[in-house]
Amino acid sequence: MKLSLSWIKDFVNIPEDMDMKQLAYDLTMDTVEVEDVEYLADRFDHMVVGVIEDIEPHPNADKLRVCKVDIGDGEIKDIVCGGINLEKGMRVAVSCPGAIVRWHGEGKPVEIKKSKLRGVASYGMICASDEIGLGDLFPASQEAEILDLSAFDVPAGTTLADALDLNDVLLEIDNKSMTNRPDLWGHYGIAREIAALYNLPLAEIKPFETDVQSDFNVELADPDRCPRYIGVEMSGVNVKEAPYQMQSRIWKVGMRPI
């Protein structure tokens, strides 16, 4: 089970200077076995938000273009790209030299370096979502589609982790260590344990209340085997895209958001 530290902090105010390895050790010794601590932003080292200032045709390749990109360091960079949805003014994910990507989301990870593509110098790489591990969070609708970050109103040069709220710590917990503790199968349960460990206040979750009445009834055919059954009837549900913060949280803990 993966847990997001920023999500846990909704319920308990963990000090900013707390050592995450110490937290993992204390949880392991007291309650559950923490198998791994991951600083999520490390996946996006040397990746920033860039703004495409201009687009020129590639002199030696019909399917490639030369983008003039502002990455916030005061110098416009030439980056060769084959994306089909490139536009002037578009915010994009730029992998600078030193970043680790997967070409077209496949194969082994490779390190980005300054290079020449068909005779034109290219500073880095303008990325599709699956090339930087974000394919489930930002699914592409067509092949060779570049990740469009124009909805994120951040300056050129903002680190990708900061721009997308991915500067988080993930705790991976061994499910076998809490099989008999269903109260720990989520962020609030672990937050409660952390609050108890360090004598921190725990935020209260207010129960959901509604005045809506329903004709939905449940009859217990065998009360000895099923002494209690709780059902909820829901109506008026509209299927639509979830807010980005919710999608991001779901993605962080290893699930695919809708």
Name each model-derived stretch.
Residues 4, 12, 25, 39, ...:
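Glycine/proline-enriched, intrinsically flexible loops and inter-domain linkers
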